[in-house]
């Protein structure tokens, strides 16, 4: 199953997340199909960018979003 979720990048104690499309059986930071945005929780205000066109495409072909990505996509 294809899912849209966050992968963590950045340093220790300095998280930065990439919004990616991946297979649900992959590890959190394993390979991904496409990167469609990013999320920086440490910046003020929190920096969120998600490509809505690609998000809608992946949802139309059956990808499921994680709870966190659903909340972030409403804010972006």
Curated annotation (Swiss-Prot):
InterPro entries named in the record: Ribosomal_bS16, Ribosomal_bS16_CS, Ribosomal_bS16_dom_sf
GO biological process: translation
Keywords, ordered alphabetically: Ribonucleoprotein, Ribosomal protein
GO MF, one annotated term: structural constituent of ribosome
One GO CC annotation: small ribosomal subunit
Pfam family, one: Ribosomal_S16
Entry-linked PANTHER family: 30S RIBOSOMAL PROTEIN S16, SMALL RIBOSOMAL SUBUNIT PROTEIN BS16M
Family the entry assigns: Belongs to the bacterial ribosomal protein bS16 family.
Name used for this protein in its record: Small ribosomal subunit protein bS16
Naturally occurring in which organism (per UniProt): Helicobacter pylori (strain HPAG1)
């Amino acid at each position: 199953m294809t899912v849209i979720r966050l992968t963590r990048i950045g340093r220790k104690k300095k998280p930065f997340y990439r919004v990616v499309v991946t297979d649900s059986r992959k590890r959190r930071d394993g390979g991904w199909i496409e990167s469609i945005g990013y999320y920086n929780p440490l910046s003020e205000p929190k920096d969120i960018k998600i490509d809505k066109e690609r998000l809608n495409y992946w949802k139309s072909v059956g990808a499921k979003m994680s709870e966190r990505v659903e909340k972030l996509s409403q804010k972006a």
